[in-house]
Design a protein with these regions (language model features):
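Bacterial N-terminal signal peptides that target proteins for export
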Residues: 1-8
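Bacterial N-terminal signal peptides
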Residues: 10-19
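Short, low-complexity N-terminal intrinsically disordered segments enriched in polar/charged residues
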Residues: 21-52, 56-64, 156-160
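A solvent-exposed, acidic/Ser-Thr-rich amphipathic alpha-helical stretch
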Residues: 59-64, 68-107
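Short, solvent-exposed coil/turn segments at beta-strand boundaries
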Residues: 62, 107-111, 132-140
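Short, surface-exposed coil-to-beta transition loops
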Residues: 98-100, 124-129
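Short beta-strand segments that buttress and anchor functional surface loops
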Residues: 114-121
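Short beta-strand edge/turn micro-motifs at domain boundaries
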Residues: 129-155
């Protein structure tokens, strides 16, 4: 009986979340935005942010693109826009501006996935994948992973 009640409660929660997401999507579409429009705009926001922040080393990009309550899943950086800005200030010390080398970008609703080719200080390459969640034109959540590109590979497929 208890298992049945827990199952029904789980179903009810999923239904409520789905309904809320669907209503939010319907509200955007009523404003004349299609899902394609939203995906394109979210990709543009992430591309602009990434170049300004990581390419141009412009810390004020945080103020323009990152929500104050920013959720950070990278264990080396604390939550919040201010904490992210402080961490980036340390990363950028002595670093030159650069053109961001985007290999792939995709979006699915409020999520944007970006795959980049980066150079390490020694000139070797690094593959970076970032995932951003956006709300109302601001980045509210972030996940990332990085991998050095090995000199040799077990297969003939490039990382980029």
């Amino acid at each position: 009986m208890k298992t049945s009640r827990n199952f029904m409660l789980s179903i009810a929660i999923v239904a409520l979340v789905f309904t809320g997401c669907q209503q939010s999507q319907q509200a955007k579409e009523e404003k004349g935005q299609t899902q394609l429009d939203i995906n394109k705009e979210n990709k543009r926001i992430v591309l602009d942010f990434y170049q300004q922040m990581f390419g141009d080393k412009d810390l004020s990009a945080v103020d323009r693109y990152i929500a104050p309550e920013y959720i950070q899943h990278n264990p080396a950086v604390a939550d919040g826009a201010a904490a992210f800005k402080a961490a980036a200030a340390k990363w950028f010390e002595g670093q030159p501006k650069t053109k961001i080398d985007v290999q792939h970008i995709a979006s699915d609703g409020d999520l944007v996935f970006i795959h980049l080719k980066n150079k390490n200080a020694d000139g070797s390459l690094k593959s970076t994948i970032d995932i951003f969640r956006l709300e109302n034109g601001k980045i509210v959540e972030h996940w990332d992973t990085q991998q050095d590109v090995p000199k040799e590979s077990a297969n003939s497929h490039p990382m980029f």
